[in-house]
A protein has these predicted regions:
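Multi-pass alpha-helical transmembrane bundles in non-GPCR membrane proteins
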Residues: 1-215
């Protein structure tokens, strides 16, 4: 298992409280929304859409939950080291999860399944990289997140032709939130990680509304 992630900068107690609370809120909200979203999607778009939306909400829940637990652990502990790897891995899962309902609902064809395969394939690669690379390059990991997110450009024609401007406007705005937030994450200044978390919450909320209610 990778050990290079142990060397991350120690954050203050206040920063870690802020980091934990921001994503704990997201985890609780997603857990509450899971049955509501799944039922609504089944009634409006059918079985495949319900499966896709469920995967999407579960992936967000796992991302928020792992982040919350990670930031609650004592710095330097084995538990925090393990949870850091899981926390970063769940970001891949959340990004791939956001593509799944869109493809299953709007692009139930070979190209759509290719996009899903690329997304989940990259997710598996990213998780293995986080776990087994001798030295994890954080900029490379961040680049993978952004590449996965902006692969949406490949499916924009299908999205625009089958949805309203509200849907794709919300999705693109969510993508921009992730991108802007990543800039705060990369700078490693005090409380910038919390700001990154807030951008993730905003992006997740926008894309949740788009996928569940406007797709």
């Amino acid at each position: 298992m990778n050990t290079s992630l142990k060397l991350s900068k120690q954050l203050s107690f206040g920063e870690e409280i802020a980091n934990s609370v921001t994503h704990a809120v997201g985890a609780v909200i997603m857990l509450i929304l899971l049955p509501i979203s799944s039922t609504y999607s089944y009634e409006t778009h059918g079985f495949l859409s319900s499966i896709g939306v469920s995967i999407f909400v579960i992936s967000l829940f796992l991302m928020f939950l792992s982040s919350t637990i990670y930031h609650s652990m004592a710095y330097g502990s084995t538990h925090k080291y393990v949870l850091r790897i899981i926390d970063h891995s769940m970001i891949y899962v959340a990004i791939a999860g956001s593509y799944t309902p869109v493809v299953l609902t709007l692009m139930n064809n070979w190209f759509g399944y290719l996009i899903i395969a690329i997304q989940w394939g990259t997710t598996i690669f990213g998780i293995l990289y986080k776990n087994f690379a001798k030295k994890v390059n954080e900029k490379f990991s961040l680049a993978l997140y952004l590449i996965m997110g902006w692969l949406v450009l490949a499916i924009i024609p299908a999205i625009i032709s089958q949805t309203t401007p509200i849907f794709w406007s919300l999705m693109v705005t969510g993508g921009l939130c992730y991108t802007v937030g990543a800039g705060f994450y990369a700078k490693k200044k005090p409380y910038f990680h919390m700001i990154w978390h807030l951008f993730i919450l905003a992006a997740s909320s926008l894309q949740y509304i788009a996928i569940v209610y406007f797709m």
